[in-house]
Regions:
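Juxtamembrane transmembrane-helix termini
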Residues: 2, 91-105, 132-135, 155-162
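Long extracytoplasmic/lumenal interhelical loops at the membrane interface
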Residues: 7-21, 33-77
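Conserved short C-terminal alpha-helix that flanks the catalytic cleft of nucleotide-sugar-dependent
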Residues: 27
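Transmembrane helix-loop junction
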Residues: 46, 95-98, 126
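Membrane-interface micro-motifs in multi-pass membrane enzymes
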Residues: 66, 74-78, 133-141
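Hydrophobic transmembrane alpha-helices and their immediate junctions
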Residues: 77-121
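Transmembrane alpha-helices of multi-pass inner-membrane enzymes
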Residues: 113-169
């Protein structure tokens, strides 16, 4: 707890604040479409203020991210991309809850509830950090969305999604 609340001497926390302020400066320069997905680590160094730099600051575009799914999206994709990310989160949680309600068996309910709670947990944590640019968390997050989708399709009652739509449907 002491480390989490220390924003005056903890290098990790100070670097997070440095990354956030750099991301906001990037956003101010390109507010609508941002700098491009995944470009933060390559463009943020010149947007750091010297007074915000820490012992773990890098100036070489050799890694790092904005330490927030939402602030990172703002810098990388601007307002448009950020709204899409927020919409993805809202729709995912809504779809998870509706699929839970619609599921007809206990196993499906447990699985979709676990996947939905995982999505909620990840994107809540995403306020302070981001890992979707790494395979370690991207795979589980997108897998949870796939689980919700598969269970939703399974309980929808439609038997074949690949049949062409006929005129009387």
């Amino acid at each position: 707890i002491q480390s989490i609340t220390n924003i005056s001497t903890d290098a990790s926390n100070l670097e997070r604040l440095n990354r956030w302020s750099s991301a906001f400066r990037l956003f101010e320069e390109r507010p609508f479409f941002g700098w491009g997905p995944g470009t933060y680590q390559f463009v943020y160094a010149p947007y750091q203020l010297s007074m915000n730099q820490t012992i773990i600051t890098t100036n070489h575009g050799d890694g790092g991210n904005a330490h927030s799914e939402y602030i990172g999206a703002l810098a990388d994709m601007g307002v448009i991309g950020s709204l899409i990310v927020i919409l993805l989160v809202i729709v995912s949680v809504y779809k998870g809850l509706m699929t839970y309600k619609k599921a007809k068996n206990k196993e499906s309910k447990i699985l979709v509830l676990a996947a939905t709670l995982a999505i909620i947990s990840y994107f809540t944590h995403g306020v302070l950090n981001n890992f979707l640019d790494t395979d370690k968390l991207a795979v589980p997050v997108w897998s949870c969305l796939a689980i919700i989708t598969v269970i939703d399709v399974y309980h929808s009652g439609k038997t074949n999604y690949f049949d062409p739509i006929s005129e009387d449907q």
